[in-house]
Amino acid sequence: MTTHVVAETMTTHVGVEMTMTHVAAETMTTHVAVETMTTHVAVETERIKKFQRMTKKKEDVLVDVVKKNGGTNMYELFMPDKNHLTKYLFFTGKGGVGKTSIACATAVKLADEGKKVLLISTDPASNLQDVFDKKLDNKGVKIDEVSGLTVLNLDPIEAAEEYKESVISPYRGKLPQSVIANMEEQLSGSCTVEIAAFNEFSNFITDSEISEKYDNIIFDTAPTGHTLRMLQLPSAWSGFISENTHGASCLGQLSGLESKKDIYKKAVETLSDKNLTTLILVTRAEETPIKEAMRASQELAQLDINNQIMIINGVLTEPTDEVSKNLFNKQQNALKDMPEHLRSMKTYIVHLRAYNVVGIDNIRTLFTDDKIYDDVEKSEVDRLPHLREVIDDLYKNGRKVIFTMGKGGVGKTTVAAAIAMGMAEKGVKVNLATTDPAAHLKYVISENKNISMSRIDEKEELKKYQDEVLSKARETMSEDDLEYIKEDLRSPCTQEIAVFRAFAEIVDECDDKVVVIDTAPTGHTLLLLDSSQSYHKEVQRTQGGNIPESVKNLLPRLRSDETEVVIVTLAEATPVYEALRLEDDLKRANIPVKWWIINSSLYKANSTDKLLAAKGNEEVKWIKKVEEHSNGNFAVIEWKADEIKGEKLKELF
């Protein structure tokens, strides 16, 4: 980057010298021209000096941000045309880190350089249509304003529905309706969506005609959790296809995959070929997205996908007020604490932008320029309710089981702790339960006469559940059938069931307390557990229908007035859409949602920094969307620089 800046500066200096020479020549002909051009030179020279000061300042800031290998190294700005990228590019990262924006800007930049580019989304939360302001399909649409760019949207949820029907339709009319309904629910989980997505995109990385047609094929993949499982499918499922001799007893998701075996094998080879494929981890300078990037990187490396680079998006470089300085320091600290594994990776940055990356002009300027307009009309929100309103309502209505639900990194644990403290202040005895893998809840809130805490170790609960199921299965099943059960117990749905059982035990033991839990079961999990008719077929068979009493007791309570699921989100597109999908899934299981909480709002922080004020202004439409969707049952918590713990939790009220 330094070389690039020096070259830019030298070029500009040459431009000034040429202009000054031009001025001298003009002096011989007309005094007016001299004055005009001298003014122009002065303005141009001042602009250059300002650019140099700005560049120097940014470099100094970035040099201070991170030190690695004992020396000072600066992260380069991400410039797709300068980074010698491979043919296939996969962008991955936690929801809301900016994968779509960076993938789109990369595609446009490469196309502007004269390359033929295909941009594909396999993300259920894709907003590519909004970004390009064009109706897209799964065949490919040319973007008129960008010569050489074709964009297509693969909808894995729609593909999963078609796939599910193709598996189930042969059995309709031949098996009882209760069995069909159970099969449908088994094929309604995330596993099926990811298999459908892999089915869709495997064609694009194995088709020789498509390969010859484009210089670069870019995948705007789903958030990390989805992507990991999607990319794990080739080796995991290929191995199981080879070993699968169970015939009709194999998992529903595997139906029809044998015919795709060769395509999958080639897709895996392409993914792990460092000369063909680059995995681009997109993250932000924040603790949770960095942890997610670390986990994704290591799990992908285990699948021999080793050609990885990282982009840190949304880096603030020039703070001007208290809020922006706090954000800047928070980002610096997150980067300094980055795990060694990620420090050794080739890493680039993209600066924080004031605008949403929608429209070709904004896409083109993402890597190079910011635009803050002083004359932009400030949007206003009529009311910004406090968390206290939510707590008062939960108390007044006598809620006994309270879940905070949302995607990773939105602040579920902190909000759960604040709700627990608020209820305890009203004299209610509360048990606060967490699934946070780092037992850091004890640093967030202290136990006292009204607050007790429980921690659920997801890995431990999963192993306990797997051992229990297999122990019972061994009593009656052949080794072949056991292999099938083992495979089923590796599914993500199994982990959700194991964790739900742990919740149920805690709720059962705390009958005299309000239980606040910092995560919630999905509607899919509840429907799998719901009763002997829709309870997971294999688990029911292996346990002889013996659903634990605690689970039997909790399932009906979830639909009663005792229970409240509180949605936690951020005032941004992806987190809001992800939260809406979570809510829809709960509605499938007849679990109503009343309250929404928008966490970490820059709008409510009232920053005077132009960049952050503009970002806050962008939040308004999402705050209004949540207000409308929730019928006014929402609260907004302002962005805070420090980790909120102890008595500071009361500031969230």
Q: Which sequence ranges carry the predicted segments?
A:
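Long, intrinsically disordered low-complexity tandem-repeat segments
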Residues: 1-45
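C-terminal lobe/tail of nucleotide-utilizing enzymes
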Residues: 54-60, 64-83, 268, 272-399, ...
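Conserved catalytic network of the ASCE P-loop NTPase/AAA+ motor domain
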Residues: 82-83, 110-113, 143-145, 207-212, ...
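Short, structured motif recognition centered on aromatic/hydrophobic residues
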Residues: 90-91, 106-110, 119, 124, ...
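Walker A/P-loop NTP-binding active-site region of P-loop NTPases
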Residues: 90-92, 97-151, 221, 231-235, ...
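P-loop NTPase motor core
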Residues: 126-188, 192, 439-490
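Switch/connector loops and helix/strand junctions flanking conserved nucleotide-binding motifs
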Residues: 126-131, 159-163, 225-229, 290-291, ...
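Phosphate/Mg2+-binding loops and adjacent switch elements
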Residues: 172-286, 292-295, 476-574, 578-581
